[in-house]
UniProtKB/Swiss-Prot annotation:
Function: Component of a complex that catalyzes the oxidation of glycolate to glyoxylate. Is required for E.coli to grow on glycolate as a sole source of carbon. Is also able to oxidize D-lactate ((R)-lactate) with a similar rate. Does not link directly to O(2), and 2,6-dichloroindophenol (DCIP) and phenazine methosulfate (PMS) can act as artificial electron acceptors in vitro, but the physiological molecule that functions as a primary electron acceptor during glycolate oxidation is unknown.
Cofactors required: [4Fe-4S] cluster
Phenotype of null mutants: Abolishes glycolate oxidase activity. Is unable to grow on glycolate as the sole source of carbon, in contrast to wild type.
Description of pH dependence: Optimum pH is 8.0-8.8.
Protein name as catalogued: Glycolate oxidase iron-sulfur subunit
Cofactor binding: number and manner: Binds 2 [4Fe-4S] clusters.
NCBIfam families for this protein: PRK11274.1
Organism: Escherichia coli (strain K12)
Activity regulation remarks: In vitro the glycolate oxidase activity is inhibited by the sulfhydryl inhibitors CuSO4 and PCMB, by KCN, but not by the metal complexing agent EDTA.
Enzyme Commission number, as recorded: 1.1.99.14
Gene of this entry: glcF
């Protein structure tokens, strides 16, 4: 796809990068077939190809309006289109650039600005998020439905973590929302890894991965959080930590992008590249281990929801399922498993109606095989699916750790 950049855009390094990405697109339209928002809305501008045209028009100096912003905002960034694209278009990078340029040219309505700023001030701060969640649980009957639905109906308390006692050690990103919404997930991870001879090291100075800010178009703040994490992890990396582990695939997908996002930062480019190379999802670590040592015989019938950030962003589709099958669990078939559940980070709060439709469609698919429980690999998906109030939804490692206790 050829573009005629304006003089302003020719002076913009990110616009030049966008132009380079656009050149790979042959506007074949394969991407529209797997786009969740296009399937729901049937509007070309709510599919990847249409959004690519909108970004092209922005780069060429056409008028940028709230409608332009609305169509770009409606994208889930699920990256299903990237899995489908035969030309290898880096759509998510293009979208980030397009959104950033549009954000500078269009002033959002006040309610949108308040919501987005509120999310940015709360979600990345675990203590604030925990306190407000506790208040929300008390006030649940009086809250709007879309907020009420996001509060956990139940949480499993974190079990004790084992001491640092093994030579093999990994860092683990604790996350922002997960310690409050699913506090046992990281503890269960540490306990399973301990049985395999791997200790999880704390990195207390590390914080939010940066995805919340970045995807709400506060991209510089997102990059600042990335730099903070690199600094927090670096001493442990130099001391020989073999991996940086993520139990939330949304965080993992973003940390794996640090190298790309900071490639032009003279101070952080090399460190960011090394961090991205060390970043692994939990399943990447476990699949290489002798799981038979755990002596688990899974006795549950599960439906696994593979998050978009795991299957499309990290290209790990089918890997959790293989691990669960190795451990003896029974898995049901899930129709249209490539489609997004509608969580998409903060999307379920910024676009509640679309998110709810996608959630209900996904729950119908997950429940079609009549599982005892639904398991997933990302806290956003877990919370969003659970908000339907139907089949119980947990992180898959918790179910593995439960089975471990029975042995």
């Amino acid at each position: 796809m050829q573009t005629q950049l304006t003089e302003e855009m020719r002076q913009n390094a990110r616009a030049l990068e966008a132009d380079s990405i656009l050149r790979a697109c042959v506007h074949c339209g394969f991407c529209t077939a797997t786009c969740p928002t296009y399937q729901l809305l049937g509007d070309e501008l709510d599919g990847p190809r249409g959004r690519i045209y909108l970004i092209k028009q922005v780069l060429e100096g056409n008028e940028v309006t709230l409608k332009t912003q609305e169509h770009l905002d409606r994208c889930l960034t699920c990256r299903n289109c990237e899995t489908t694209c035969p030309s290898g278009v880096r759509y998510h990078n293009l979208l980030d650039i397009g959104r950033d340029i549009v954000e500078q040219k269009v002033k959002r309505p006040l309610p949108e600005r308040i919501l987005r700023e509120g999310l940015r001030q709360v979600v990345p701060r675990p203590a604030v998020f925990r306190a407000l969640t506790q208040v929300g649980l008390v006030l649940r009957p009086f809250l709007p439905e879309q907020v009420r639905a996001k509060l956990p109906a139940e949480t499993v308390k974190a079990k004790p973590r084992p001491p640092l006692r093994h030579k093999r050690r990994v860092l683990m990103l604790e996350g922002c929302a997960q310690p409050t919404l699913s506090p046992n997930t990281n503890a269960a991870t540490a306990r399973v890894l301990d049985r395999l001879g791997i200790s999880v090291m704390p990195a207390n100075e590390a914080g939010c991965c940066g995805a919340v800010d970045y995807h709400l178009n506060a991209q510089e703040k997102g990059l600042a959080r990335a730099r903070n994490n690199i600094d927090a992890w670096w001493p442990a990396i130099e001391a020989g930590a073999e991996a940086i582990l993520q139990t939330a695939s949304g965080c993992g997908a973003f940390v794996k992008e640090y190298g790309q996002m900071l490639k032009n930062d003279a101070l952080y480019a090399d460190k960011a590249r090394q961090v991205s190379e060390l970043a692994v999802d939990l399943v990447e670590l476990l699949r290489e281990e002798p799981l038979e040592k755990l002596a688990i015989r899974g006795d549950k019938k599960l439906a696994f929801h593979c998050p978009c950030t795991l299957q499309h962003a990290q290209k790990l589709n089918g890997e959790v399922e293989k691990v669960l099958l190795r451990l003896g669990f029974t898995l049901t078939d899930v129709p249209d498993s490539h489609l997004c559940c509608g969580s998409a980070g903060t999307y379920a709060l910024t676009h509640p109606d679309l998110a709810r439709q996608l959630r209900d469609n996904k729950m119908n698919a997950l429940e079609s095989g009549k599982p005892e429980m639904i398991v997933t690999a990302n806290i956003g998906c877990q919370t969003h699916l659970a908000s339907a109030g139907r089949t119980s939804v947990r992180h898959w490692i918790e179910i593995v750790e439960q089975a471990l206790e029975k042995e």
